[in-house]
């Protein structure tokens, strides 16, 4: 088993070389993004393939797909939430990393479903395996059901937008909206990540907290 990172160390090339030197020929690659997105899952797959080819490693690569609805992932997510929720919490916000709407359209293999059919994310289609928004909605529903939450006790939003045309609702707006509705004890979970990072620790835990408290 080797760990590799896109923009840090150990690099993908270094980790693939380590596996090759160990005599491995067939490699299972697990992009640690629970939900499929062009900017994360797809670009990671393409980069691993490129390095394998350019470096002449000749490794047989198999990529493990999105795991947004796997029982183990949902249970782990629920455990994290239960272990960290405030006592007498009023509300749970599922805040996901945002992506441009155009990415949803580009990854739709049917070219006729995403953002073109009413309530597209609620309908089963050939686009779902590649639709980030539909997948995060399903993750949230599965988790909320397992936690026994009523529909008025949780919501979904998207953080880190850059410019117009990104999927909504936006987290910063939702934080203000919830505060204005009288929510006082809010819990926020970021299921798009399997580990904490600058986005969860600073943007959400610091900036998001400040936005909510000042609303």
Model-flagged regions — what are they?
Residues 1-215:
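Active-site-proximal alpha-helix that buttresses catalytic centers in soluble enzyme cores
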